[in-house]
């Protein structure tokens, strides 16, 4: 087991997610790694991962997409989140530092804090698959955030040198900034290792692109429930918390576009066992080396699906090579010549980076649904819920955040439910069956008076809510 020293040279300095110092390019590319090289062998990061003993300090809700914010605002968001948890958690290293009052723009971006596991010693394992947070004593996982669910990472800022912060989505906290407190000097190693994992995962994607590039891998293994509860920009619903005993899927949310010819008639689906997910009760303090062996690994990705979705970082030099090899000649990127530093961790979706046109079936599906009275087109969650009055009322709407995704909204026992209808393979399905189309799914359940089973509860389709003409 290698020690986590940075070698004889200067440690990589990381400021606000931008790997700083002369060792890094200012072009936002991971191609030119530090002159001393990465801290760890690639096969270790691509395999079991690199583990660090740190303290989990909690998380702060992030109410806006990090991609909608400029780089400086993102950095301010993570700094403010660190300050908030330091003030709230006893014994935090940064608790005694005075901070300026939260500015009005930041107060509209940051929401509530979740300090459920604050101060807990954990083993952070960084790999190309995920950031895995496991209780250091009882070895239970408190969070497992897949790389494709992480939109920003920051560490090593002079004012918060002991902290690493990253923004990720999961079903429990929705989008939140998670804070890790590191032993002295370790934060820079942690953020560098995260950078190495992003680099390697993107290279895996370039070597093994899918036959049809669609943003469909927000989950590493399909367990039949990881995609069927909708998550949108609004943070007011945490569906997996609504059902006692329901185990949330691994971190990340499905973001899928339809694929031509993917749908099939009703067939039984293959399910995988659910894995420990975003929050579990855990234990007490433990001490040890900075690097420990990982006790529990996340399930490996499905074969042929080694790719990012949202967010993916743009490795400019590799993309240029890929375009040249493919005969493409996209327009030059203005940041390649250093005109503006690129945020290394908040990454554009791969389909944008590789300039892939949208999947053709999305349009035909939309056209087909226009003939259904219960289809309301693009509608927000709040607007859809306002149309439901009686138990059994339902409608179908197009997701406002994911093109090509359709959401079934219904009222059951006085509670609105929102179910995604398109799985990560582009198939219209429920947990138990596949369908030729959304219309087929609706008519099947209505005509046979069958409820849709999701997250341990039932949704009955009784009264379609017609759209207003």
Swiss-Prot record:
* Listed GO biological process terms: actin cytoskeleton organization; angiogenesis; animal organ regeneration; cell-cell adhesion; cellular response to growth factor stimulus; cellular response to hydrogen peroxide; cellular response to insulin stimulus; cellular response to phorbol 13-acetate 12-myristate
Q: Which InterPro entries match?
A: CEP152/SHC-Transforming (IPR051235), PH-like_dom_sf (IPR011993), PID_Shc-like (IPR006019), PTB/PI_dom (IPR006020), SH2 (IPR000980), SH2_dom_sf (IPR036860), SHC_SH2 (IPR035676)
Task: Using the record's annotations, give every residue carrying the modification Phosphotyrosine.
Answer: 239-240, 313
Annotated GO molecular function terms are:
ephrin receptor binding; epidermal growth factor binding; epidermal growth factor receptor binding; insulin receptor binding; insulin-like growth factor receptor binding; neurotrophin TRKA receptor binding; phosphoprotein binding; phosphotyrosine residue binding
Give any Gene Ontology cellular component. cytosol
Q: Where is the SH2 domain?
A: 374-465
SUPFAM superfamilies, sorted: PH domain-like (SSF50729), SH2 domain (SSF55550)
Coarsely, its chief localization is cytoplasm
Q: How is it modified after translation?
A: Phosphorylated by activated epidermal growth factor receptor. Phosphorylated in response to KIT signaling. Tyrosine phosphorylated in response to FLT3 signaling and by ligand-activated ALK. Tyrosine phosphorylated by TEK/TIE2. Tyrosine phosphorylated by ligand-activated PDGFRB. May be tyrosine phosphorylated by activated PTK2/FAK1. Dephosphorylation by PTPN2 may regulate interaction with GRB2. Phosphorylated in response to FLT4 signaling. Tyrosine phosphorylated by activated PTK2B/PYK2.
Residues carrying Phosphoserine: 29, 339
Supply the Pfam families for this chain. PID, SH2
Q: Which domain of life is it from?
A: Eukaryota
The PID domain sits at: 46-229
On whether Phosphoprotein is a keyword of this UniProt record, the answer is yes
Q: What segment(s) does the record annotate as region CH1?
A: 230-373
Function comment: Signaling adapter that couples activated growth factor receptors to signaling pathways. Participates in a signaling cascade initiated by activated KIT and KITLG/SCF. Participates in signaling downstream of the angiopoietin receptor TEK/TIE2, and plays a role in the regulation of endothelial cell migration and sprouting angiogenesis.
- Subunit and partners: Interacts with CPNE3; this interaction may mediate the binding of CPNE3 with ERBB2. Interacts with the NPXY motif of tyrosine-phosphorylated IGF1R and INSR in vitro via the PID domain. Once activated, binds to GRB2. Interacts with tyrosine-phosphorylated CD3T and DDR2. Interacts with the N-terminal region of APS. Interacts with phosphorylated LRP1 and IRS4. Interacts with INPP5D/SHIP1 and INPPL1/SHIP2. Interacts with ALK, GAB2, GRB7 and KIT. Interacts with PTPN6/SHP (tyrosine phosphorylated). Identified in a complex containing FGFR4, NCAM1, CDH2, PLCG1, FRS2A, SRC, SHC1, GAP43 and CTTN.
Protein name per the record = SHC-transforming protein 1
Which organism's genome codes for this protein?
Answer: Rattus norvegicus (Rat)
